[in-house]
């Protein structure tokens, strides 16, 4: 069971595209409606609301043409975005034990999930969840799918709490569970994932999904956000253990082996791990995705990582005006 106590705040969820969703949300739609962002101007037509008339523009046009002309400003609707959280539940995502001074991935994933869900609720979004781990109602390797749903009350945090309860499942998903999840979302009926929907994929990405699985999700117009959860010492790099005896165990912690690495072997592992992270980031960059790199289970650090992601989207003009 993975539970984290305390609040983590929220971050903006800047969309890359105008979305298509349910009315009365907080993001700009591709449809016209009663929002705030101006989509364009046109001549008045019978049935248009009088409040939609741009009186200054109408006065200028009327003066030029010496006749009564009325200009109406069309605006984009404000819609509810969809946010789906995909969690990698491979056994490797249970590392490292909480009593060791390294990244405890279950806590990092829990804080990421809590932050994403709370931020989605803050922006009046629908929140869904998917993983392939075992749960009381499903076995490992089967999709544990909860379609996007809305917050039932503005005075309660039940949607965030419910989403956090999904993390109580096992870390026993197959190696290809992220790929399975992306393909499942493309096939499942009634997923509710419309153009511009967020799909946050939380994983260490040591098992990268095939490019076509990621490309398929992108091709559907979804805003795929990889959340990379890796220990900065053992996975993003490797410590200088040359000449020291160190014990290494398997994922389940059942078998341990003491080895002594040379300086050269430790350096090779460091280079290998750093190149692996660089390759992961390069894959996402080539797909024009904006990943979030999480290296700590401290909620302050998790919040800072997502805040940097949101600010970078604004910096590079990701937000649609």
Model segments located where?
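Exposed, interaction-prone extracellular/peripheral surfaces
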Residues: 1-33, 43-51, 57-66, 72-114, ...
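Short domain-edge segments at the starts or junctions of modular domains/repeats
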Residues: 39-40
């Amino acid at each position: 069971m993975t539970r984290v106590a305390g609040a983590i705040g929220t971050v903006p969820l800047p969309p890359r595209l105008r979305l298509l969703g349910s009315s009365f949300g907080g993001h700009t739609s591709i449809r016209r409606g009663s929002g705030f962002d101006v989509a364009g101007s046109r001549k008045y037509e019978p049935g248009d609301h009088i409040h939609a008339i741009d009186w200054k523009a109408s006065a200028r046009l009327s003066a030029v043409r010496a006749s009564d002309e009325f200009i109406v400003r069309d605006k984009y609707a404000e819609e509810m975005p969809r946010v789906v959280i995909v969690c990698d539940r491979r056994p490797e995502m249970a590392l490292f034990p909480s009593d060791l001074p390294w990244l405890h991935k279950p806590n990092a994933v829990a804080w990421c999930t809590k932050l994403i869900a709370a931020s989605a609720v803050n922006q009046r979004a629908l929140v869904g969840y998917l993983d392939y781990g075992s749960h009381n109602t499903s076995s490992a390797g089967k999709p544990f799918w909860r379609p996007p749903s809305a917050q039932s009350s503005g005075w309660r945090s039940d949607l965030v709490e419910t989403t956090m309860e999904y993390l109580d499942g096992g870390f026993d998903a197959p190696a290809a569970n992220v790929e399975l999840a992306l393909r499942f979302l493309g096939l499942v009926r009634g997923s509710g994932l419309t153009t511009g929907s967020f799909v946050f994929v939380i994983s260490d990405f040591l098992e990268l999904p095939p490019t076509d699985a990621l490309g398929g999700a992108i091709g559907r117009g979804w805003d795929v956000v990889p959340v990379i959860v890796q220990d900065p010492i053992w996975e993003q790099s490797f410590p200088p253990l040359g000449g020291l005896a160190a014990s290494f165990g398997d994922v389940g912690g059942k078998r341990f082996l003491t080895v002594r690495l040379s300086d050269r072997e430790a350096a090779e592992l460091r280079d290998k791990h750093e190149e692996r992270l660089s390759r992961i980031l390069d894959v996402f960059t080539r797909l024009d995705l904006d990943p979030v790199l999480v290296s700590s289970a401290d909620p302050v650090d998790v919040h800072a990582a997502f805040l940097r992601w949101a600010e970078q989207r604004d910096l590079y003009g990701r937000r649609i005006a």
